From Swiss-Prot:
Disulfide bonds: none annotated. The chain crosses the membrane at residues 14-34, 81-101. It comes from Pelobacter propionicus (strain DSM 2379 / NBRC 103807 / OttBd1). Belongs to the MscL family. It holds the Pfam family MscL. PROSITE patterns: MSCL (PS01327). The lineage of its organism: Bacteria, Pseudomonadati, Thermodesulfobacteriota, Desulfuromonadia, Desulfuromonadales. This is Large-conductance mechanosensitive channel.
Amino acid sequence: MLKEFKEFAIRGNVIDLAIGIIIGGAFGKIVDSLVKDVIMPPVGMIMGKMDFASLFLNLSGTEYATLAEAKKAGAATLNYGIFISTIVDFLIMAFVVFLMVKQINRMKKEAPAPVAASDSKDCPFCLSPIPLQATRCPHCTSNLK
């Protein structure tokens, strides 16, 4: 059983999958930082110095100035600012994956199949296709040798 597991784990597909998951996790962190630290601050500034991560609806009756205060008090909140950031995060990831798949598919396009050696030739007199071994054309009856 251990031998079977070793063969399974060493098989190329499993290793490729593991590498893909590791790279995907790291790429996800990069995109997350891009959204939170690069994209959302200018968008928030354009919209009146708004920090999207701090946008929330308080579902309890008590007033809280910030999301951190509401969380500290244990109040029920609807954190739509964080949700907006997550949607932007997802859209960027989906677009990048789309571009990667598109490029991979473009590189994968199969080359045209080589033309197989023909088993016929054209008659020099009537230009009809005839077998390579033919000594007389079956169409015009010309002698080919």
